[in-house]
């Protein structure tokens, strides 16, 4: 067995920094894919793919393709996790996957927005579908091993909160750069580029930055120096059955499924809320998102301390409650009198709390559940637990992605793709999903999980001290 080294701050930084790239790519896909390919009249973007409810009479093309992408992603999650958990690569079970997936992960995110023809048609439809699906496959190949590596390297629950805080910080700052897309697009348009080239130039810059950051862990982290793993010997189906037999895992996964679906509704529609519902220009979204991001970053130290002191469950429940209220405000308060920009900025400040909580603590909560299982079974199955959770949550997200585009067309005027009533309904449905998450997290017995982790940790520390005395 290898002598395990202490994980240094430099290694933690190398592990966390790819989240900046993931934040960039997530902003591209979650915030702008629907806006780019199902354009409103305010955007000036030409129509490039088939519009309307063309699949089964209820689904839009983009909604269907993205939903299928999430299903592909969900199905490949346990397959990749199983391969990673059982890998015998001399460089480790996780890092080699990340190394080879990094470049195609970034390139596929860019190529989604580079449909070759300037008008809707079969060629563009096929192009967009293939690269959306490729993006989700390479996302899985990179992120499942990446997520599984953390519980193996960091076993202290309080230190793990710190690492997830840094993880979230990089993700949020990457997302923040993604959120300034309208400003960068405007700058490129002012420089003489047409609207499509302006969007693509912006995303090309993001892609170059993202790929470089994705490759850093592969260069800097020598996995075998920080992890001693016991490979599982059971089959994929047995591993999945074992994961879902854990009651703590079931409740946490259900809560994250519902909360993540609610967030998908919000992210997919934020540009529409700003431009079509509030009547503000595209560039206003930059200021609004900046306020929510800066507000959430200011709350990070408080949330981190709260999570260490009282556990992750209470802050997450309150974060979901506040986010539910925010969604209901969008639905029922959109037509309230008052300056639109003032209302938008007020909402941005309000959602900064759930943004902070739901970016930091859910991952750390799941890592606790995974460690609990490892301590009770003696086998490291971090990959399959991450994949099982991802499988369920992505199926839920797929449902959301199918629903959102179909809802947004409700009440649309003739010749337009977006209706005010449909946007209000998306906010209402998103709020109901988040309310369901509150109930699921209430059912999770965090105290039982943490009690075992602390008990085993104290026992391990006592054993280590006894060895020192004996020597």
Regions found by a protein language model. Give the residues of each.
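Membrane-embedded alpha-helical bundles of multi-pass transporters/translocases
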Residues: 2-471
């Amino acid at each position: 067995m290898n002598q395990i080294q202490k994980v240094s701050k430099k290694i933690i930084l190398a592990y966390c920094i790819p989240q900046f790239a993931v934040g960039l790519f997530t902003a591209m896909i979650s915030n702008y894919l629907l806006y780019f390919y199902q354009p409103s009249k305010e955007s000036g973007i030409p129509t490039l793919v088939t519009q309307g409810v063309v699949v089964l009479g209820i689904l839009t093309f983009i909604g269907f393709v993205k939903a299928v992408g999430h299903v592909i992603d969900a199905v490949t999650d346990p397959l990749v996790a199983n391969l990673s958990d059982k890998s015998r690569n001399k460089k480790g079970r996780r890092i080699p996957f990340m190394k080879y997936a990094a470049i195609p992960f970034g390139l596929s995110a860019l190529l989604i927005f580079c449909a070759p023809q300037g008008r809707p048609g079969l060629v563009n439809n096929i192009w967009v579908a293939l690269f959306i699906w490729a993006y989700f496959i390479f996302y899985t190949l990179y992120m499942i091993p990446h997520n599984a590596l953390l519980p193996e390297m960091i076993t202290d629950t309080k230190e793990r909160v710190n690492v997830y805080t840094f993880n979230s910080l990089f993700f949020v700052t990457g997302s923040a750069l993604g959120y300034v897309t309208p400003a960068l697009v405007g700058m490129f348009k002012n420089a003489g580029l047409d609207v499509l080239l302006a969007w693509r130039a912006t995303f090309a810059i993001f892609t170059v930055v993202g790929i470089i950051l994705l490759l850093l862990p592969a260069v800097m982290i020598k996995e075998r120096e920080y992890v001693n793993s016991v490979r599982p010997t059971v089959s994929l189906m047995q591993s999945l059955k074992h994961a879902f037999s854990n009651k703590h895992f079931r409740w946490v996964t259900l809560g994250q499924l519902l909360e993540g679906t609610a967030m998908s509704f919000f992210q997919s529609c934020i540009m529409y809320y700003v431009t079509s519902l509030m009547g503000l220009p595209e560039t206003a979204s930059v200021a609004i998102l900046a306020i929510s991001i800066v507000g959430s970053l200011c709350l990070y130290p408080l949330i981190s301390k709260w999570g260490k002191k009282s556990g992750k469950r209470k802050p997450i429940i309150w974060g979901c409650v506040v986010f539910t209220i925010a969604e209901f405000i969008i639905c029922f308060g959109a037509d309230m009198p008052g300056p639109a920009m003032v209302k938008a900025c007020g909402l941005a400040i309000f959602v900064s709390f759930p943004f902070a909580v739901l970016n930091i603590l859910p991952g750390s909560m799941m890592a606790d559940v995974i460690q609990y299982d490892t301590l009770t079974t003696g086998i490291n199955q971090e990959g399959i637990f991450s994949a099982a959770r991802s499988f369920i949550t992505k199926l839920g997200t797929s449902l959301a992605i199918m629903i959102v585009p179909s809802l947004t067309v409700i009440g649309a005027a003739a010749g337009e793709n977006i209706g005010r009533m449909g946007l209000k309904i998306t906010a209402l449905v998103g709020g109901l999903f988040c309310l369901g998450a509150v109930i699921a997290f209430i059912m999770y017995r965090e105290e039982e999980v943490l009690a075992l982790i602390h008990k085993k940790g104290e026992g391990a520390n006592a054993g280590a001290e006894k060895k020192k005395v004996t020597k």
